[in-house]
Amino acid sequence: MSQTLSNLTFCNLDKEHDLPLVVELLKTIQENGEDAGFEVVSKEVVSQASELYGQDPARDIWVVTAHDPVTLVGYGSFFQWGHDPHPVLYIGVHPQWRKLGIGSALVERLIQRARESKCQDVDCTANQEHQEATAFVLRHGFQPISAFTHLSIPADHGFPEPVFPPGFSIRTHAEINDINVFLEANNRSYEGQWSHKQGTLEDVAGWFATIPPEQIYYLFAPDGELAGITRGLINVSASEGVRISDQPIGYADAPGVIPKYRSTALYRALLLYGVHALLPRRPVTIEIESWGDAQETLAMYQELGFHIVRQDVAYRRVL
């Protein structure tokens, strides 16, 4: 059968039947050196992400099927976390089924979904090295707004001790034991940064339960006011909340500082505190997943010896 759009079926996800096929498609895309929407692709990861974002498969996820033989050739997903006004779209098309309009047809369906939810805009990302993906999102009216940057460094690199300005201090969640502080820290420490969401206790409860309280570090100002947060995780992707390796991989998870306290010096001290907290657990590497950090913060990470593994440009389309 010839490969044409008219020979394909577009429908919403049947989770029980389609999920293994979605995983197979995303693995094919990832093996082609392209963004699969997840750092680790598995049935567990895709299913957990869907539950975390409260996706309704009958409205939020589209699949595209060819019939000779039966093959899943396209996947489109609408993610909206809690009450965040900027939903994120992901579109993946099988490498052998491109240039047929599948991606454009999925964009139309996901944009319609966003309009039904009265969203004023939608976001997506594209790896800056993938020119076809960049051209696709620009052609569909998206404009660059920020970036996701994954940085890494060998754990035996050697790190200076953290130096905080006078009066600033760190306390763990185990010491404070109040989920409201966790919520406030996550809502305020990334304020104004792309991809960081304003959540409720209900939104963060599931994620919070996966993090040991002694690995959550709060930054306090001299007057006792909350000033920031970071976390130290082993073998758990900061962005996906799943085990990512059988080797000990450390994540200095998203140092965040409340806007009125922000300075490169505080970000540096907070990062180094998290790194030194990880080192006794003997990780092979230390990773940072930066979502929307300022250029001077990224530059500071690199001055410490971190190198960029991957950078995805974030785009937004106004509806």
Please identify what each model-predicted range represents.
Residues 190-222, 226-235, 255:
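Phosphate-binding active sites in nucleotide-utilizing proteins
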Residues 139-159, 272-319:
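Active-site/acyl-donor-binding loops of N-acyltransferases
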Residues 1-49, 163-197:
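Short amphipathic alpha-helix that is part of the acyltransferase structural core
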Residues 1-6, 80-86, 94-167, 312-318:
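Acyl-donor-binding surface of acyltransferase catalytic domains
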Residues 193-195, 219, 227-230, 238-248, ...:
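Extended hydrophobic-aromatic, low-complexity segments
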Residues 93, 255-257, 290:
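Hydrophobic adenine-recognition pocket in adenosine-nucleotide-binding enzymes
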Residues 11-12, 16, 26-128, 227-253:
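Conserved donor-binding loop and adjoining core beta-sheet/short helix segment
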Residues 99-112, 254-257, 263-280, 299-303:
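Conserved acetyl-CoA-binding loop-helix of GNAT-fold acetyltransferases
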